[in-house]
Amino acid sequence: MASGTHAHEKYWPVIEAFFDYYGLVGQHLDSFNRFVREELQQVVDSVGKLTPKIEGYVVELGDIEIGKPTIREADGSEHDLTPNEARIRNLTYASKLFLNMTPVRKEGSVSTRLETLKVYIGNMPIMLRSEKCHLHGKSDDDLIRMGDDPKDHGGYFIINGSERV
């Protein structure tokens, strides 16, 4: 039994190197980034177009756009929303989702594409330290200045001010 234990010791450097590189949340961040960067658009592309109840029209679905979290204040001003502010103010750390939509009018065999519209379709919670997070790529000094812990690797969401996995 003791020799079996020693045989496994040679694997620990590989395991430690994996966690040093990815951390405990690396897979969560990679998965979320892939979802935002590729898979969300693939869902839109698979739908392709909508047929409204208005005869002679279809709506072609285009690119989806996701920015970094912002907040609009009561006075109408808008600014970047940081995770720390979301926690303190009991807000959801989320980004606005926009979808480019092009109405197409069909009259007989003639189709006329109208002006493409950038349409707000909702908000999406943003995973902390993902590519869409304001903390992504920041130095330790910047993180401290923003009110966040440099040792916090992210991989979770802030919903109504509470951290959720």
Outline where the language-model segments fall.
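Conserved N-terminal architectural modules of multi-subunit, DNA-dependent RNA polymerase core subunits
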Residues: 1-165
